[in-house]
């Protein structure tokens, strides 16, 4: 399927309507190409049309919109020192209806919706019993179900970012110029209808060439999330119903129990392409700089935990113009100011756009929960081949005389370390000075006991999130930006958290914790599993390789009391409210950075409180209206009201409040 998707990248932007505001008929769009409308009356043409409906899925991962619209402006991340698009993190006046990402989200999703509408109508009308592809009703039903699942998904993305949007579910037979916004409740009715209708005709999952297509697991996962989002509303009006949480539980359980998808045994198996291969050399000796290999990325992409992902190709001839670029935005500046380090493929191209907040670092149990060290890179291994200018062992600090004059760090050994010690365990600067590493960044340090605690963490020296690290990429050019990881939209761990939250919202905290603890059992250190020495050197943890499952389990007291480990906002006073914040914390621990956070905070009506509390970069202009994005100006100037261009008054009425 990926091959076909990439072949038609050039095609769909011309043939199919890219934005809902276009008034051209389908036949007029066709005339600018060598194809005719008749091509889409053939089974091959209809197959290509279906596949074209997947192309807009890639947009999220192809540039800086990825983090801007999901991770910036939340409690999890703040700005690095080379920040772009700061308006999404600070919520300043530059976030407005002229914004390129707002327009891109709108046009890409409506491009997908348009293709879905066309495919649904044309396939329903197709009648050729001799067709190998669409000759039976079951074959037609399968493709129509795919398109309905995608349409529901695209509308779900839209309603979470914009609120009410125009609902278009047919291909207009005449030019259309007016697109009134439906209410949020009406959009959710459409989303739920599409995803419900799609599920029964789809297979639970694909395991080979068709991986990446919509499946029943995909439809029901997002159906559960749609019910959860609608039913989470307290002050917002989303058309919520008393049965929404029951529906969440029903569909999420169906995915968990019947889809054939399974959690990875090791949390790190989802992201292992970013982890180093190789052996640290003996002191004074050179080894090899860390490497990865394409097989690890292929394994990450093929994980059975992944329910739905945008597909990216590693074939230069088939790849999109941008491919997956999310690996660019999280690395710290390791290639300057870190002796022994230079830019390489393994550590990535450090755009330094965003760094984790203190909340994000503190919310993990670093001693018992492996997710922290499998999410954040704390060690950089020397990759500079020349010893010139690098510190050597002296007679005063060499562990044995044979090492005098040799580099303190050989190639492949630890050149720099980020120590994530807690504030109540600061490291003395004299201790840091005696470490053999070329660079040490302590989160908490002091010159002497009782003196002020300071930090080495900064806007360009911070913890790198390596979930999206891509040490292979499309070419071997050192600054190659086009990655080859797929872009994950849904994995089974999220389904577990969705069903857990639904049970908790119904007051069944015991069942909620059962699902949470399934993930915590997975992420606990196993007996003899390697772990960071920081645990016992700087955090007060035990110097053992014991199983930590028992210590990693969540208990009721984490939200029935004001547990210090959960960092609850001071305004949160009830068990019910603490449970919601506990689930947000659990989503950070499991899903940090995976492009959910802004929508999670909006869904739970906590965006304003949590972002103000934990993100030091937000501006004073950050306000409640920022829970929605502005409607693109391009949409408004391209349509009419009662046959006339939109007036300023019409635009103000059409626009979201505050913009």
Model regions and ranges:
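Short coil/turn linking the two alpha-helices of tandem helical-hairpin repeats
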Residues: 157-160, 164-166, 229-238, 507
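An aromatic- and glycine-enriched ligand-binding surface/loop that stacks and positions planar moieties
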Residues: 24-84, 229-434
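Conserved, well-structured interaction surfaces
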Residues: 43, 47-60, 81-162, 176-189, ...
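Long, intrinsically disordered, low-complexity segments
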Residues: 20-26, 54, 95-96, 109-112, ...
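Acidic, glycine-rich segments characteristic of secretory precursors and extracytoplasmic regions
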Residues: 2-4, 23-78, 89-92, 96, ...
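C-terminal substrate/ligand-recognition segments
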Residues: 99, 103, 370-374, 378-524
């Amino acid at each position: 399927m990926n091959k076909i998707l990439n072949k038609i990248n050039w095609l769909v932007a011309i043939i199919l309507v890219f934005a809902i505001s276009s008034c051209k008929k389908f036949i007029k769009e066709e005339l600018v190409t060598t194809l005719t409308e008749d091509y889409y009356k053939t089974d091959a043409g209809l197959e290509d049309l279906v596949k074209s409906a997947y192309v807009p899925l890639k947009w999220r991962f192809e540039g800086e919109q990825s983090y801007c619209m999901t991770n910036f402006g939340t409690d999890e991340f703040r700005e690095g020192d080379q920040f772009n698009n700061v308006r999404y993190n600070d919520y300043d006046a530059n976030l407005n209806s002229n914004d390129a990402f707002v327009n891109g989200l709108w046009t890409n999703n409506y491009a997908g919706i348009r293709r879905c509408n066309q495919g649904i109508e044309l396939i329903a009308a197709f009648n050729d019993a001799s067709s190998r592809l669409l000759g039976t009703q079951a074959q037609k039903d399968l493709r129509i179900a795919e398109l309905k699942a995608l349409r529901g998904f695209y509308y779900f993305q839209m309603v979470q970012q914009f609120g009410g949007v125009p609902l278009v579910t047919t291909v207009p037979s005449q030019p259309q110029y007016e697109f009134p916004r439906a209410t949020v409740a009406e959009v959710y009715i459409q989303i739920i209808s599409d995803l419900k209708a799609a599920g029964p005709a789809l297979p639970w999952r694909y395991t080979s060439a068709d991986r990446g297509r919509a499946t029943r697991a995909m439809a029901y996962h997002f159906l559960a999330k749609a019910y959860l989002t609608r039913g989470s509303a307290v002050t917002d009006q989303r058309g919520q119903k008393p049965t929404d949480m029951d529906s969440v539980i029903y569909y999420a359980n169906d995915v968990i129990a019947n889809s054939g998808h399974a959690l990875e045994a090791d949390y790190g198996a989802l992201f292992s392409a970013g982890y180093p291969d190789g052996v640290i050399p003996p002191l004074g000796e050179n080894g090899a700089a860390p490497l990865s290999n394409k097989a690890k990325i292929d394994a990450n992409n093929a994980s059975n935990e992944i329910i739905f992902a945008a597909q990216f190709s590693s074939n230069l001839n088939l790849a999109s113009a941008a491919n997956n670029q999310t690996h660019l935005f999280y690395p710290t500046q390791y290639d300057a100011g870190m002796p022994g380090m230079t830019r390489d493929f393994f550590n990535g191209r450090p755009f330094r756009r965003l760094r984790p907040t203190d909340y994000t670092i503190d919310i993990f149990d670093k001693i018992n929960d492996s997710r922290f060290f499998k999410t954040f890179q704390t060690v950089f291994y020397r990759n500079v081949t020349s010893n010139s200018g690098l510190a050597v062992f002296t007679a005063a600090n060499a562990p044995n005389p044979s090492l005098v004059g040799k580099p303190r760090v050989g190639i492949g050994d630890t050149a720099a370390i980020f120590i994530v010690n807690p504030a109540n365990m600061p490291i003395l600067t004299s201790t840091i000075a005696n470490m053999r590493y070329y660079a040490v960044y302590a989160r908490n340090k002091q010159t002497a006991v009782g003196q002020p605690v300071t930090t080495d963490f900064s806007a360009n020296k911070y913890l790198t999130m390596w979930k999206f690290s891509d040490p292979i990429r499309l070419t071997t050019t050192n600054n190659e930006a086009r990655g080859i990881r797929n872009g994950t939209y849904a994995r089974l761990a999220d389904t577990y958290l969705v069903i857990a939250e639904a049970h908790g919202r119904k007051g069944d905290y015991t069942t909620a914790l059962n699902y949470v603890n399934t993930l915590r059992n997975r992420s606990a250190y196993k007996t003899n599993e390697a772990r960071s020495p920081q645990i016992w050197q700087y955090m007060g943890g035990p110097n053992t390789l014991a199983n930590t499952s028992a210590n990693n389990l969540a208990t009721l007291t984490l939200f029935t009391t004001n547990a210090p480990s959960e960092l609850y906002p001071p305004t949160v006073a009830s068990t019910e409210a603490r449970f919601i914040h506990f689930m947000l914390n659990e989503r950070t621990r499991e899903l940090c950075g995976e492009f959910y956070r802004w929508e999670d905070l909006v869904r739970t009506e906590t965006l304003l409180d949590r972002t103000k509390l934990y993100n030091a970069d937000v501006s004073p202009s950050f306000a409640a209206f920022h829970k929605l994005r502005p409607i693109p100006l391009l949409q408004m100037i391209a349509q009419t009201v009662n046959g006339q261009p939109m007036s300023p008054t019409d635009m103000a009425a059409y626009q979201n409040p505050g913009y």
